[in-house]
Amino acid sequence: MIEELTARIATVEGVDAKLKAFFDWHEAWFTSEVFTGCLFERAIGEYGLSEPELSEVAVRHKKALLALIEGVLQDEFDAGETKRLAGVILMLIDGATAHARAFRDPRTARHAWRATQALLVEARQRSAH
């Protein structure tokens, strides 16, 4: 998954285009026949941190997603803003994934992208001052 996302993001230039590609990839996944939600999220939900061999894999996956998003954002934002935005964007895609699974609605990726656009506008306005 991380490799696919990385490859997809590498095909476009600019922070917005890369993040849009990230959300587009998720929307395509949400519409696929194999989509059953996030295995890593389910593992954490089922076992919590009581099964370290499972939870560590899930946490590593989430950290890899976070690093991927941070890598995109660091081209435009300082370290603090990059961390803040990446954390919120990861929460948005996690929520979109859960919602898409529960309600069979792949448009949640699009809604999360629109929320991300608003966050980017706000962050750019703050950094301009």
Regions found by a protein language model. Give the residues of each.
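Short, charged helix-capping/linker segments at alpha-helix termini
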Residues: 77-83
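Hydrophobic alpha-helical connector segments
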Residues: 6-32, 86-89
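Amphipathic C-terminal alpha-helical segment
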Residues: 29-32, 90-107, 119-126
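Amphipathic alpha-helical packing segments from all-alpha helical-bundle domains
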Residues: 2, 17-20, 50-75, 87, ...
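N-terminal hydrophobic signal/anchor transmembrane helix of membrane proteins
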Residues: 12, 22, 115-129
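Amphipathic alpha-helical segments used for helix-helix packing
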Residues: 32-53
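Short amphipathic alpha-helical interaction patches enriched in hydrophobic/aromatic residues
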Residues: 5, 9, 48-51, 73, ...
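Residue register of alpha-helical TPR repeats
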Residues: 42, 84-91
